[in-house]
Amino acid sequence: MKTLIITGASAGIGLATARRFADAGYAVTNISRRPCPLPSVNHLPGDLSNAGFLDTLGDRLSEALAGADAVSLIHNASRLLNDSAADTSSDQLRAVMEVNLAAPNTLNRFVIPRMPSGSSILYVGSTLAEKAVPNSFSYVVTKHALVGMMRATCQDLAGRGIHTACICPGFTDTEMLRAHVPEEAMDAVRGLSAYGRLIEPSEIADTLHWAAENPVINGAVLHANLGQVER
């Protein structure tokens, strides 16, 4: 059986992705503080902001990986703050890096040795992985670094039959977006898409599933943003 290990599948893109992979016959395990509401998903409670989050999960995660024909590891969970280069403390930056960068590295070190050929490691980036906007300093910094992590992963795993990619969603209708963008600004955000709408989480889930099944995109950054209008 194919196995999906995903972080942050309690809502938004993560939840839609867990559903998409489960529908495709994957055994799905989620790691997050809040449980994934899908009854078929194996939930491992973990706080990715805690550097030792795997200390209590290792045995159960090993069980989830045991006997898998192929493993897809999706680094979906992330933290987004309203902050800027002028006022973000190093402690605040480290806290965001713990979730957005260190946790993926921790999981990679654990999961990669247990991955058979035919597996994949997918990073959920953002349009802000290759550009910047004001007041999203730590998010922009860490998402840029996530692209570097993906590219380094690709090079380091060459010849092992494990492919990787970074999928960069545009403005997606998630709890995170609505918490970050005031309601009165949502029409303007929709206008930044060539289609004049927000992306549905299921559209990103479909993209992630396709990426997991197609190693030809190994090392690629895939923009999933409906054609973002530059202004």
Regions found by a protein language model. Give the residues of each.
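Active-site loop-to-helix junction immediately N-terminal to the catalytic Tyr of the SDR YXXXK motif
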Residues: 88, 132-140, 152
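Active-site helix of classical SDR
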Residues: 108, 142-143, 150
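Alpha-helical segment proximal to the catalytic Tyr-Lys
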Residues: 113, 155-156
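Residue(s) in the substrate-gating loop at a strand-loop-helix junction
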Residues: 126
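C-terminal substrate-recognition "lid" of short-chain dehydrogenase/reductases
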Residues: 197-224
